[in-house]
Design a protein with these regions (language model features):
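An alpha-helical, amphipathic repeat domain used for nucleic-acid recognition
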Residues: 1-211
């Protein structure tokens, strides 16, 4: 048997201090429902159940703290909770609960990420896809999000304007066309888009590869 020797309340949780010197963190609602107070005794079975519930509560709290910084993908959350030392089953249950409640949604995350990224800077689908893949979003979800956002194909006029600005900034430097192509690849534009822009530069600016 275990005896509760002290109870410390903070926000939505209670820390039970036992006569063994151990502390158990629980949701305040659980403690109220179990009618636990200082002097209460807890059986071994009850202790094990409380330990499990405490771990589950701490896992969910850690998840919400992580989400408070910014939205996360399912994969990011799983990796974070793993680093925090929670076991696989605990993480799976927590992630499933968060997904059911709408706190984790890779489709919504991808759509918002793409929209925010494009508002900040003109980039291509390859870069967007690579960034989302690093965050653990599946290829299927990424492809759908790019399509919905209209980012599957870049607007040639916009990319050309970006390339022309870069081209002019290079001044009389050699191999400006190659540098432009490399610049556009770094921005994540696909081969067809880069080819079209480079050809337009050659046509409208009269530039050659060996200049």
């Amino acid at each position: 048997m275990y005896a509760v020797v002290a109870m410390k309340y903070r926000d939505d949780c209670v820390t039970l201090e036992l006569d063994t010197g151990e502390s158990i963190l629980l949701p305040a609602s659980d403690v109220t429902g179990l009618s636990i107070r200082v002097g209460s005794t807890i059986s071994r079975e009850g202790y094990d159940m409380m330990k499990e519930e405490s771990r589950r509560f701490q896992c969910k709290r850690a998840a919400f703290d992580y989400l408070a910084i910014r939205p996360r993908t399912v994969s990011e959350m799983e990796r974070y909770l793993t680093r925090k030392g929670f076991d696989v089953d605990m993480i799976r249950g927590t992630v499933e609960d968060l997904a059911r409640s709408g706190y984790l949604n890779d489709e919504d995350y991808a759509a918002r990420y793409i929209g925010a990224r494009l508002r900040k800077k003109l980039v291509g689908r390859n870069l967007l896809a690579a960034e989302l893949q690093r965050r653990g979003v599946s290829r299927h979800v990424i492809s759908h999000a790019l399509k919905v956002a209209g980012a599957q194909t870049a607007a040639i006029d916009e990319v050309y304007g970006l390339a022309l600005k870069k081209y002019n900034s290079l001044g009389p430097a050699k191999n400006r066309v190659s540098k432009i192509a490399s610049f556009l690849r770094g921005r994540g534009f696909d081969f067809d888009t880069i080819t079209a822009v480079v050809e337009r530069l050659r046509s409208e600016q009269g530039c050659e590869e060996d200049e």
